[in-house]
Amino acid sequence: MLGRWLIFAGVAGYLLTAFHPAPAPVVHEVQMGARGGNRFEPATTTARAGDTVRFINGNGGPHNVQFFPDSIRDPARDLLDRAMPGEKLGWLSSQLFLDRNEVYDIVLPKLAPGRYPFFCLPHAASMTGAIVVAP
């Protein structure tokens, strides 16, 4: 009797997880230099693999997105660098954005949960942020 119950519980658990749809990808918007300030708004964004983090140049820049390579371990560094589209200023660094409302999308790859800090190269002293990858 106990054996049948365990089999039933195992099958039910499998069915609940196998057919539970994954959350739909979400677009998270981050303003760069909005309202005349040199900052990212919001400064911290929580996202999952498959979500898009959309950086929007709010004031015409120049702005960019540069991840701190020393704070990100392999293989996450390489995965994140490959997820950054277009021409780059360097490793883990987007190009400069000069036009107001210019958009830069990063579709998050499957990264280990944790904090992935970034900054704007021209305004590094005050313009910092982070993507927190949720499990």
Mark where each language-model region is.
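Bacterial N-terminal signal peptides
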Residues: 5-17
